[in-house]
């Protein structure tokens, strides 16, 4: 069988443009001041200090700018006037049709496949059963793959059917090919690009590294039908990327900020996009890209096909799926129970509220002695506590900095850069502010305050143990948190962690607690002249 393969011959393939690296761009505004007028750093935008006025310079730029997309026009979609397009290509193979429901269920159980939604297609067990056209299959066979992975076996029929799809699977599960091969089929069924047309397939990814990896796969499997692509990300010159977009590409793989730059500058448009992919959606939200994603999606016709992929399924990712996808079908690989990364050692200590500071300091001492290159992310329940313990740590000689919603954006970027580079190996954060944190080499997470729910606990500790590394999560748990004990014990048990007998007792008998001692919102505005500018004590550490 074939899928609209008649367009391939007129395409000239070229690999995407632009080398270089992913970055936020534009400088960090790297100055700050205290009462002595201390200021330092660098920035393309300039900064200064006199008489204690901290130097904010440079701004953020690149993929971090919160006002990106302000210049994009609101689209009023009238689908009755828009050209129709094909998106349903799946025809079930006879071998698949002949399998009994029992056989299908057994296959899904064996491969830990769970599906949700109406009329989910049956999984395929071989590449031939997926029904890809020869121009795709020739390259698949050339790669020497033995059989589809679990996510591919179930995901290919779903994506080829033209339905909106959510896929939840660990990194390394083969999800990139799960959406790339149907994307190639989709492109070859559409009219050729005309001059001035934007891409047909748009893939949004959180980082340059992932975007380049996706581009490699698209290039490999799209070359037989001469599909052109480009990779658009910040921190590198725009020229080569603009050149590619101007020539015309069927596939654009992009990080959100740089794509909005291109759209605002009129270098491309999304009018032809009919196949949208959000890859690593959870990580894009972690990095604070939700506003940019929403602005981009608003520029795409609403009857598109959308495929959303994520390693986890927290409530903010679920909300994104509800907003962007229509009547979607979902595939999950592995358990859907709330579980923590098994590479993370979880230590939960029962303490009283007034013991927390000393206990935290002792842990930092041990961490420092074991490895001076450690990075520690400390979570608090409120902005006030974040500032309080940052001052406490700095006065005790620890180079700690805090990040929360009352800090100005350029200060938050500066703090994050100090933490990423290891100049300040301790960062104190609230849950909301942590959405912009994407640091791969965090060795320890310390929960100074326990979060409001177990999902946030798993999300917090997941900041360590990334990319195959091991990590440690330390949690200070008080009687005020007793109502969370049962859920916490379940998470610890699932990941085979040691459980403090007192915590187990709380789980058996505990009920509601009084919440955090501080309660409420933090008061006052943060700033370089506040907690982050508190002088380091004489007992310098780290």
Swiss-Prot record:
Catalytic activity: ATP + H2O = ADP + phosphate + H(+)
Top-level class of the enzyme under EC nomenclature: hydrolase
Domain Helicase ATP-binding, chain residue ranges per copy: 156-331
CDD domains (alphabetical): SF2_C_DEAD (cd18787)
Main location: cytoplasm
Gene3D superfamilies: P-loop containing nucleotide triphosphate hydrolases
Short sequence motif named DEAD box, residue ranges: 279-282
Membrane-spanning residues: none
Entry keyword set: ATP-binding, Cytoplasm, Helicase, Hydrolase, Nonsense-mediated mRNA decay, Nucleotide-binding, Nucleus, Ribosome biogenesis, RNA-binding, rRNA processing
Annotated GO biological process: nuclear-transcribed mRNA catabolic process, nonsense-mediated decay; rRNA processing
Domain Helicase C-terminal stretches: 346-507
Listed Gly residues bias regions: 514-527
InterPro entries hit by this protein: DEAD/DEAH_box_helicase_dom, Helicase_ATP-bd, Helicase_C-like, P-loop_NTPase, RNA-helicase_DEAD-box_CS, RNA_helicase_DEAD_Q_motif
Binding site for ATP: 169-176
One GO MF term attached to the UniProt entry: RNA binding
Region (Disordered): 514-542
Protein EC: 3.6.4.13
Subunit structure: Associates with polysomes.
Domain notes: The Q motif is unique to and characteristic of the DEAD box family of RNA helicases and controls ATP binding and hydrolysis.
Family, similarity comment: Belongs to the DEAD box helicase family. DDX5/DBP2 subfamily.
Physiological role: ATP-dependent RNA helicase involved nonsense-mediated mRNA decay and ribosome biogenesis through rRNA processing.
The protein, known as: ATP-dependent RNA helicase DBP2
Organism the protein comes from: Ajellomyces capsulatus (strain NAm1 / WU24)
Gene: DBP2
């Amino acid at each position: 069988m074939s899928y609209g393969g008649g367009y391939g011959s007129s395409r000239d393939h070229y690999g995407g443009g632009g080398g270089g690296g992913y970055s936020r761009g534009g400088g960090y505004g790297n100055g700050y001041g205290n009462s002595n007028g201390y200021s330092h750093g660098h920035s393309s935008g300039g900064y200064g200090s006199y008489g204690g006025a901290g130097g904010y310079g440079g701004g953020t730029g690149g993929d971090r700018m919160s006002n990106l997309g302000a210049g994009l026009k609101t689209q009023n979609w009238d689908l009755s006037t828009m050209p129709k397009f094909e998106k349903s290509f799946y025809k079930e193979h006879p071998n698949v049709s002949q399998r009994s429901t029992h056989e299908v269920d057994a296959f899904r159980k064996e491969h830990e496949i769970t599906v949700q939604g109406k009329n989910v297609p049956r999984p395929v067990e071989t590449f031939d059963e997926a029904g890809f056209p020869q121009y795709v299959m020739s390259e698949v066979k050339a790669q020497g793959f033995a059989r589809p992975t679990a996510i591919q076996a179930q995901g290919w029929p779903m994506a080829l059917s033209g339905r909106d799809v959510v896929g939840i699977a660990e990194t390394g599960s083969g999800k990139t090919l799960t959406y790339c091969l149907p994307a190639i089929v989709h492109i070859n069924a559409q009219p050729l690009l005309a001059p001035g047309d934007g891409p047909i397939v748009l893939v949004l990814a959180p980082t340059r590294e992932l975007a380049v990896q996706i581009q490699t796969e698209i290039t490999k499997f799209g070359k037989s039908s001469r599909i052109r692509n480009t990779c658009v990300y910040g921190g590198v010159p725009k020229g080569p990327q603009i050149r590619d977009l101007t020539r015309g590409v069927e596939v654009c793989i992009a990080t959100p900020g740089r794509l909005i730059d291109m759209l605002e500058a009129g270098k491309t448009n999304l009018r032809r996009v009919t196949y949208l992919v959000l890859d690593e959606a959870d990580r894009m939200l972690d990095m604070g890209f939700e506003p940019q994603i929403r602005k981009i999606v608003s520029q795409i016709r609403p009857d598109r096909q959308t495929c959303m992929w994520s390693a986890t399924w927290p409530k903010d990712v679920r909300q994104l799926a509800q907003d962007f996808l229509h009547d979607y079908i979902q595939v999950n690989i592995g358990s859907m129970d709330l579980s923590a990364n098994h590479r993370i050692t979880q230590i939960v200590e029962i303490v009283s509220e007034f013991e927390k500071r000393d206990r935290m300091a002792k842990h930092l001492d041990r961490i420092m002695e074991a490895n001076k290159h450690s990075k520690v992310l400390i979570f608090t329940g409120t902005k006030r506590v974040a500032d309080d313990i940052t001052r406490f740590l700095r006065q005790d000689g620890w180079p700690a900095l805090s990040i929360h919603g009352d800090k100005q954006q350029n200060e938050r970027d500066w703090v994050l850069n100090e933490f990423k580079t290891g100049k300040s190996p301790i960062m104190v954060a609230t849950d909301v502010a942590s959405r912009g944190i994407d640091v791969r080499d965090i060795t320890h997470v310390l929960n100074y305050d326990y979060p409001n729910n177990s999902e946030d606990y798993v999300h917090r500790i997941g900041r360590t143990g990334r990319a195959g590394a091991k990590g440690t999560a330390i949690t200070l748990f008080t009687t005020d948190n007793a109502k969370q004990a049962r859920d916490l014990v379940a998470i610890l048990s699932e990941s085979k962690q040691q459980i403090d007998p007192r915590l187990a007792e709380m789980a058996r008998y505990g009920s509601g607690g009084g919440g955090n001692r501080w309660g409420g919102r933090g008061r006052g505005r943060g700033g370089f002249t506040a907690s982050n500018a508190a002088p380091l004590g004489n007992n310098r550490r780290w």
